[in-house]
Structures are given as structure tokens and as C-alpha cells.
A protein has these predicted regions:
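Conserved glycine-rich acetyl-CoA-binding loop
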Residues: 115-129, 138, 149-156, 160-161
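C-terminal "cap" of GNAT-fold acetyltransferases
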Residues: 148-151, 171-206
């Protein structure tokens, strides 16, 4: 009897969980207003990869930490990966990537990059807000990421969103072996963070 109940429970609530997950990972192309400027938001496509690599090079002094194969492998994993891009006038300005781990209930930000000339305009905050909200919808415990020790501007943004430093990874980054700061957002304590940025025509003021 107990086995039958467990099987019934798993079928009913497991399938419901899967529906919620599929809905959460789905993103419709839409326009958003961030600080009164209109942008276009969409899921990343394979055709976006060359521009994503160019943004990496612009951000990381000519280096591209991820190559086209790495990005393509990520985009194929639609069940547990989500990559979004922001465009204006058909130019890719920013992107973000995240893994969604059902076992640990953690959304891990794998990539976030904004063209230097568009930094400080709220694009990074907006993209993080989307991922945070999706993790909340999935009832996850945390959103996590790594950031260079030297990247104080990014650290300020993450702390403003209530991320906390949880550790240091020594020699983490390829090439220069710079240390990384581990940071986590504990969602049950910060459910109201990053409400902006998940619906069409959303206004991001910070």
C-alpha cells in the first residue's frame, strides 16, 4: 500500500513539478524598458554565439573564456540551462547564463557579460533579476556565482542584490589564475529581491 501511495505521489507531484519547470525555463521574446530605454530580450540562439564571444573579448581584455563549442554545448541543454540575451537595434549588448540544479536546488550563474559601453545602465541587474525570479518560482534555495576578486563593481552589484560572500576559490580563472569570490543569494531570506525585470515592458530603475 505504501509503495502504491509513493508511486501515486511521485506521478502526480513529479509531473506537476516538471510542468512548472518547463514553464519557468520558457522565455518569450519581448521588449523591456530599463531606465526608460527600450531593449529586446530573448533566449540565446546558436546564431548568437559569435556575438556572445565578441562581448567576452570586449569585457575580458581580448580573451574569450568560453569558445563556441562550450556555448553550443550549454545551449543544447535546455532542460537545466537558460541563456538570455539583450539587444538594441539588433546589436547584442549583454547576456547571462545559468544552470538550474534540481538536486541542490541552486541556480548557478555561469556567465554574465555586458558590453563596456553599456555597463552601469541596469542591464546586468535586469538579467540577474530574471534568473533570481525563476529560481524563486522553482522554490530553489540559492542563486550562486563566482566573481573576480578584482571586479569590485560587480561585487557591489551582487551585494546590492543581497548576495553574500561564502568563500574564495584560489587561482580559479584560466590564464591569469586570479582568485574568485564565491557568492550566494539565499532565496528564502530575500524573496522580494529583483522583482523587476521578468515581465514584458518591465521598468528597472536601479
Amino acid at each position: 500500500m505504501l509503495k502504491k501511495f509513493k508511486s501515486w505521489y511521485k506521478n502526480i507531484f513529479g509531473s506537476r513539478r516538471e510542468v512548472v519547470r518547463e514553464e519557468t525555463m520558457d522565455v518569450k521574446n519581448h521588449r523591456v524598458a530599463i531606465r526608460d530605454v527600450t531593449y529586446f530580450v530573448a533566449k540565446a540562439l546558436f546564431t548568437d554565439i559569435p556575438e556572445m564571444i565578441e562581448i567576452e573579448r570586449a569585457v575580458y581584455a581580448g580573451q574569450a573564456p568560453w569558445d563556441s563549442t562550450a556555448f553550443a554545448n550549454e545551449l543544447r541543454r535546455e532542460k537545466d540551462r537558460l541563456y538570455l540575451v539583450i539587444r538594441k537595434n539588433d546589436k547584442l549588448l549583454a547576456f547571462i547564463g545559468s544552470t538550474f540544479d534540481e538536486r541542490t536546488r541552486d541556480a548557478h550563474i555561469t556567465n554574465i557579460a555586458v558590453l563596456p559601453e553599456y555597463q552601469g545602465k541596469g542591464l546586468g541587474r535586469f538579467l540577474l533579476g530574471i534568473m533570481i525570479k525563476k529560481a524563486q518560482k522553482l522554490n530553489y534555495k540559492t542563486v550562486s556565482l563566482e566573481v573576480r576578486v578584482s571586479n569590485k563593481n560587480a561585487q557591489r552589484l551582487y551585494r546590492d542584490l543581497q548576495f553574500e560572500q561564502t568563500g574564495i576559490k584560489r587561482g580559479y580563472y584560466f590564464g591569469d589564475h586570479e582568485d574568485a569570490v564565491d557568492m550566494e543569494l539565499f532565496l528564502n531570506e530575500n524573496e522580494d529581491e529583483a522583482e523587476d525585470g521578468v515581465e514584458p515592458e518591465t521598468r528597472e530603475q536601479n
